[in-house]
Amino acid sequence: MDYEKIIHALIDDIVAEPESVLIRATESENGKDVVILVACEKDDTARLIGLHGIIANALREVISVAGRNENKHIHLKFESFGEENKED
């Protein structure tokens, strides 16, 4: 199953810059765990996590259901990139 495409379909309407979102899925050696890393701009990361993590938890639940069909445990992680030392 292409977890990267599923995540893109879910988040493209949420983020401001969908073309700058990087998604990488890495499967464990035992084949039962998959770690999906979503990296995007700081503001988009905040949108994906949502207030009190509501959106992130919903995304994790949806992707977990997809993983259950293949007996896989999915871990969804978020990271941001961009200008770290922004000067005013």
Language model: regions and residue ranges:
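The feature captures the beta-strand-to-loop junction immediately N-terminal to the Walker
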Residues: I49
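RNA-contacting regions in translation and RNA-metabolism proteins
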Residues: M1-A46, I55-A58, V62-D88
